[in-house]
Amino acid sequence: MRTPIIAGNWKLHMNPEQTVEFVNAVKGKLPDPSKVESVIAAPAVDLYVLKKAAEGSDLHTGAENAYFEVEGAFTGETSPKVLNEMGIDYCIIGHSERRGYFHETDEDINKKAKALFANGVTPIICCGESLETREANKQEDWVVAQIKAALDGLTAEQVSKLVIAYEPIWAIGTGKTASADQAEEMCKTIRETVKDLYNEETAENVRIQYGGSVKPANVKELMSKPDIDGGLVGGASLDPESFLALVNYQD
């Protein structure tokens, strides 16, 4: 049985003081982690206080990016080794904003996934198509290619532990949401791709999130779908009450 996982992606929002206020507002009201896993992925400058504030609570922590080298002359990058030393649980890689603005390639994302696993941090690997690709009805081919590239060289055991986030680019921060049926169709395709690459057990274990304008008003419908195991949430994760409504969607 896959444990649902709702992860907030704060992007370039929140300072350390706001981070502590947020955690204090939510930490006593989170669901049992055996029922729903609650995660906040914060900017690197907030991670230390996020982890400290979340200690003793059911809030898991995540980074928004990491490099594929653990140390060296890589100005401005984040070390997966240091994330592990800080006790950070997850790291988002391959987000469309990283791919688009910072020209990250499928090869980069694959190297990052391997580096994170080598350093004991669980990757949340993002994939998703543009509006142009969807209108050409090539969304499945696009996402399957992204998944194959991202998972190249990973073991079945590793893949069964990671999280894949399907985020159609046209639905991120636009207010447009893929319908629950569209989201389910693509998450099912991702699961079938994992089955083809590995085996049925691995495909049944991997958790697949939907991301793209997820909010309290649509989370229940999305989470009712058999192949959607969670949400990767942007704007709706910045407000404590909104985040609590998302993670407590089963209530």
Curated annotation (Swiss-Prot):
Pfam families registered for this protein in UniProt: TIM
Query: What biological processes does GO assign it?
Result: gluconeogenesis; glyceraldehyde-3-phosphate biosynthetic process; glycerol catabolic process; glycolytic process
Q: Identify the EC number(s).
A: 5.3.1.1
Q: Domain of life, per the record?
A: Bacteria
The answer on whether this UniProt entry bears the keyword Cell wall biogenesis/degradation reads no
What are the subcellular locations of this protein?
Answer: Cytoplasm
Q: Which residues form the active site?
A: H95, E167
> PROSITE patterns this protein is in?
TIM_1, TIM_2
What are this entry's molecular-function GO terms? triose-phosphate isomerase activity
**What reaction is this protein's catalytic activity?**
D-glyceraldehyde 3-phosphate = dihydroxyacetone phosphate
Task: Keywords in alphabetical order, please.
Answer: Cytoplasm, Gluconeogenesis, Glycolysis, Isomerase
Q: Where does substrate bind?
A: N9, W10, K11, G173, S213, G234, G235
Asked if the Swiss-Prot or TrEMBL record annotates the protein with the keyword Cytoplasm, the reply is yes
Cellular component terms per the entry's GO annotation = cytosol
Pathway(s) of this molecule? Carbohydrate biosynthesis; gluconeogenesis; Carbohydrate degradation; glycolysis; D-glyceraldehyde 3-phosphate from glycerone phosphate: step 1/1
The similarity annotation says: Belongs to the triosephosphate isomerase family.
Instruction: State how it assembles.
Output: Homodimer.
Functional description taken from the UniProt entry: Involved in the gluconeogenesis. Catalyzes stereospecifically the conversion of dihydroxyacetone phosphate (DHAP) to D-glyceraldehyde-3-phosphate (G3P).
Give the protein name, as stated in the record.
Triosephosphate isomerase
- The organism named in the record is Lactobacillus gasseri (strain ATCC 33323 / DSM 20243 / BCRC 14619 / CIP 102991 / JCM 1131 / KCTC 3163 / NCIMB 11718 / NCTC 13722 / AM63)
